[in-house]
Amino acid sequence: MSAGDISAINIKSVKKNRRRKKRRTADVSSSDSSSSDPSSESEKEEIQNGAIEEHVGENGKSDHVFSKGNDEDKQEDIAIEVSDVELTDEESKDLKLNSKEVIDDLTKISLSKIPEPTKSQNKEGFMNASKIAENIKLAREEYNELAENFVPKGKDKTKLREEYLNLLFENYGDDINRLRAAPDFTNKSLSILADALQEGIGMFDIGELELVLKNKEMEN
């Protein structure tokens, strides 16, 4: 072989080697893309369905946790809350009636649980209060009767009143005489004066009159 033939063979072998290298790199890139495509597509789908959260584990590797359907759940919760608030007039009336019926039923149950002795005790207490009021009324009537019929020892009411009038004339006799000597003093004026003195005596009970007269006697 000549030198030209050898150089031509070398050029061909170099070209073949270059083609083999290109095929290998193409195969490697295609295998990488094929192996990475499913994961990327699945990640895209999972990202569309929910949010990706990255957590670092104990071995230092990052794990991806997918929380699916958060937005959809929130939308459902919001829809439920709105539907709970938005009630029609008829539904609100029915709700009020039902609650009232429940309260009435609970009240009936509570009343039915009251023992019978409690009811009888209340009845006895009412009867006792009425009896006490009646006894107070009777005692008051008896007291008024005793006060009206009370007579001091050795003296009656008329005599006590006369003694009290004499006591008044002794102390205020000059004033009474001046009134009687006035030019406008008449028999009518005399009766008015007598009535006034009698009413003054009525301000005291028998015991008080007796005490006043007794003190006056002790002074003399």
UniProtKB/Swiss-Prot annotation:
Low complexity composition-biased segments: 29-39
Ranges of biased composition (kind: Basic residues): 13-24
Main location as per UniProt: nucleus
Keywords: Nucleus, Phosphoprotein, Ribonucleoprotein, Ribosome biogenesis
GO CC annotation terms, alphabetical: nucleolus; nucleus; preribosome, large subunit precursor
Region (Disordered): 1-91
Residues recorded with modification Phosphothreonine: 88
An individual GO BP term: ribosomal large subunit biogenesis
Protein's cellular compartments: Nucleus, Nucleolus
Highest taxon of the lineage: Eukaryota
Ranges of biased composition (kind: Acidic residues): 73-91
Biased amino acid composition, Basic and acidic residues: 41-72
Modified residues (Phosphoserine): 83, 99
One Pfam family linked to the record: Rsa3
Miscellaneous notes: Present with 2940 molecules/cell in log phase SD medium.
Assembly information from the UniProt record: Associates with nucleolar pre-ribosomal particles. Interacts with DBP6. Together with DBP6, NOP8, URB1 and URB2, forms an RNA-independent complex, which is required during early maturation of nascent 60S ribosomal subunits.
Cited function: Required for efficient biogenesis of the 60S ribosomal subunit.
Family per similarity comment: Belongs to the RSA3 family.
Protein name: Ribosome assembly protein 3
Protein encoded by which gene: RSA3
